[in-house]
């Protein structure tokens, strides 16, 4: 009886671990809103952003279309990072963070700077908007 119970518990543990993995794998497509954690290009393809990690921080690396690094910045801790999103008609880049909220980085002369006065366009949907927060 103990052996059967042990086997059943092992099967249940494997099932739970597989279920959790499937949920995690689907998170970017279903829970990030307009934001992504994947490589993403500006509206015209002139720039693309790619995220890496350094210590406990997320690093946003911005490259030109010919793969030259243009600018790099660290917007938030990796544990709070929920993705980035380009605006549809500019090079403004929005960062979604669990502790800082949604922040805009505007570009001037290929330098992206935090713009606390920026107004998020309606078409950029936060994961928090979708959750009703």
Predicted segments, located by residue:
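Sec-dependent N-terminal signal peptides of Gram-positive bacterial secreted proteins and lipoproteins
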Residues: 4-24
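N-terminal export/targeting and maturation segments
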Residues: 20-76
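Repeated scaffold domains used in trafficking and secretory/extracellular systems
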Residues: 33-40, 77-86, 121-132
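Short beta-strand elements that form the blades of beta-propeller/WD-repeat-like
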Residues: 45-53, 89-102
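Beta-propeller fold detector
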Residues: 71-75, 113-120
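Intrinsically disordered, low-complexity regulatory regions of eukaryotic proteins
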Residues: 80-83, 91, 100, 118
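Short, exposed beta-strand-loop hairpins at the edges of beta-sheets
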Residues: 95, 100-110, 114-115
């Amino acid at each position: 009886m103990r052996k059967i119970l042990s086997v059943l518990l092992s099967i249940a543990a494997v099932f739970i671990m597989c279920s959790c993995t499937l949920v995690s794998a689907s998170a970017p497509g279903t829970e990030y809103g307009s934001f992504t954690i994947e490589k993403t290009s500006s509206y015209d393809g002139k720039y693309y952003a790619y995220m890496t990690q350094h210590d406990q921080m997320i690093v946003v690396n911005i490259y030109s279309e010919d793969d030259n690094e243009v600018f790099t910045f660290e917007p938030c801790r990796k544990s709070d990072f929920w993705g980035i999103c380009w605006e549809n008609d500019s090079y403004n880049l929005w960062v979604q963070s669990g502790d800082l909220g949604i922040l805009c980085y505007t570009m001037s002369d290929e330098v992206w700077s935090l713009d606390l006065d920026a107004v998020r366009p309606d078409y950029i949907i936060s994961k928090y908007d979708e959750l009703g927060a």
